[in-house]
């Protein structure tokens, strides 16, 4: 079916939980922008498309911009979107939906530059609007993030930059602005394999000239300490990032602890530098494999827990078989054993194998499936996929 704002509201209204408490982390969400569009419609009494046309597009002279609120409407000069095939050719890849606000803006590079020029001058809506648009978010921990009001604020080659990318189906776009140089670049492409951000910054390089910092201060050097081979071995093996259930592994090669093949620099007996990021293993774990904390250069923190390899027998896999239903998604899946492997089966009988990533967890068929038990029996399974951290399916059979 063609998705509309009515369908979006229906789906959102069925959600029972959040990925995290507001302010604990940052994760982009389309839903917030969809809800904003609906909110504008309810407050103004106008469609979001009409409100945008009269209050934003026409005042800014964006005469070739409109929302894709009816994907069947013929739009003059609209480019068809494509994506590459494995055979080296292209096939059409169009967005057949009417949901908009999060995306779905039909526009041109010229109109995008008119929009971002107003973010530079504030000619329309004034200085308070500009301040609000560029104010970066702050998490509960006090850490400032790059994301402001639909804008990413940061630096490119030492130059202050405000940018955002976008994509849907086979369309790709990137809009960047360098406020101190009064420079903006917009790139749009109708090929799903295009990288408009790279193209835009290549153009920007031609104009930024001497503003580019070619000798940025080097990251502070860290002095390596010596860690015995036996201690390094304690940190090896597979780990799960608890936030998104991704599986990662540490190994020791040529006397160095490695993460995904990259050698880490020991800066303490339990701390290892990974560029400007740091892994810190629990020093109080005793003889057991320790948990770890991964801190990114911008201060984001990921908890990592050790996980043992899981090589289940057919009898082990049978514990996970059954039907699981999600009222939130209005979907029911079956898990069955097929040819010695667990497989997720949809209502059409299509079976997709999933492989073990740890006890009670399997990867494949669109994400990671984490099974939960009560009283010695599997009762539910959570789907972790991209920005969905815990979509719960209850066992019904």
What are these regions (language model features)?
Residues 85, 136, 154, 188-190, ...:
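Structured loops at beta-to-helix junctions and adjacent beta-edge loops in soluble globular domains
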Residues 106-109, 193, 197, 229:
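Electropositive phosphate-/nucleotide-binding environments in soluble metabolic enzymes
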Residues 163-164, 174-191, 290-295, 379-383:
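Short, well-ordered beta-strand elements
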Residues 170-213:
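Structured C-terminal helix/loop/strand segments within mature extracytoplasmic catalytic/sensor domains
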